[in-house]
Amino acid sequence: MAVNSSNTAPQLMKSCNDILLFIDRKNSPVYTEFILIYVKERYIMLDKKLKSAALLAIEKNAQRRVIPFIYNDINYYIKRRMSNGRNTFAKSSPDTAFYREAYKMLSVNEAVPLAPPVVLLCDDFIVTEDTGTPLQVVAKRLSVEESKNIFFNAGHALATLHSHGFWHGRPAIRDITWHGQEQKITFLDWENKVPFLKTDPQTIDLFLFLQSCFREEWPTNELIDSAVSGYLSLPSEKERFADVRAFIQDHSRIFAVCRVLSVFHWIDVLSVDMTASYVMNLSDK
């Protein structure tokens, strides 16, 4: 399925996205097989020395699913085709999740470099380059003033992803990295499926991104405001917040329950309520 013409790339991306949305929602073994064929035909990359280093790292960490290692003074990560033993609501079977993630990363990077660069793809594991520090850690290590521009870039990167017709699935700030030297945002962990079957996945993306920020219980909303400004800086995506507000209104009963339960300070529930309140009170810019 190799495509060399730049004129056919947009059509291919739309077709790939339509198929991927079906896979996310139906979790079909047939389309899982399609992903495997697509990935293998186009992207099998084999650096024998790198593969040997990766296999050695796996041998030393046989029970781990994600393994960092160093090869030729460069930091890499291995992600293996095995279950993490949790979060079955958001994630699929190990095989489906593995091939979905490979497909998503490679497809996204064809259009815009916002996924980790895949340097080695094997039947049972993927090797990607290290992409920097998670935003969750950035917010803890740096001052608010130092972090604002980084979160602006994160919001802009998410809008850029959406503007190309893609979505992440769960863009939590622990799975978004900042590479200071390259001044680059990267989204990790692409194996999540769409949890709300009748909702636009990009709308869910934006809500979950904000909710992951509110989970941190920062004393102010300055970093969240910066991320929102970054998202709104891409004109084509400005209407996305209206979609999020519509989503909240369409599921008002669920959010009303979250509001009542927020008094117990369960962070997952509280952060949902805080996100909904923030979005509903957000003025259009």
Residue ranges and their predicted role:
Residues 31, 39-54:
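Juxta-kinase regulatory segment immediately upstream of eukaryotic protein kinase catalytic domains
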Residues 116-151:
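Conserved structural core of kinase catalytic domains
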